[in-house]
């Protein structure tokens, strides 16, 4: 379960970074 939470947080972080980069453009 802990691994799943870590993966989800990692994925959410990537999505947030992607949105930030797109908005930055």
Curated annotation (Swiss-Prot):
The keyword Ribosomal protein applies. GO terms for cellular component: ribonucleoprotein complex; ribosome. Keywords: Ribonucleoprotein, Ribosomal protein. The gene is rpmD. It comes from Pseudomonas putida (Arthrobacter siderocapsulatus). Part of the 50S ribosomal subunit. The keyword Membrane does not apply. This is Large ribosomal subunit protein uL30. Belongs to the universal ribosomal protein uL30 family.
């Amino acid at each position: 379960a802990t691994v799943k939470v870590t993966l989800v947080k990692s994925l959410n972080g990537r999505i947030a970074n992607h949105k930030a980069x797109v908005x930055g453009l």
